[in-house]
Amino acid sequence: GLRDFNVAVRASNGKYWTRRPESGTLV
């Protein structure tokens, strides 16, 4: 979904856990 896409983008920037750790899909 769109959320997963945004998560992927944030993860690539290393700010995934900083923004939304509860969605922990990639990590």
Curated annotation (Swiss-Prot):
Subcellular location: Secreted; Nematocyst
Alphabetically ordered keywords of this record: Nematocyst, Secreted
Transmembrane helix found in the keyword field: no
Gene Ontology CC: extracellular region; nematocyst
Keyword presence, Secreted: yes
Taxonomic superkingdom: Eukaryota
Note from the entry: Does not have hemolytic activity, phospholipase A2 activity and acute toxicity in crabs and mice.
Stated name of the protein: Cationic protein C1
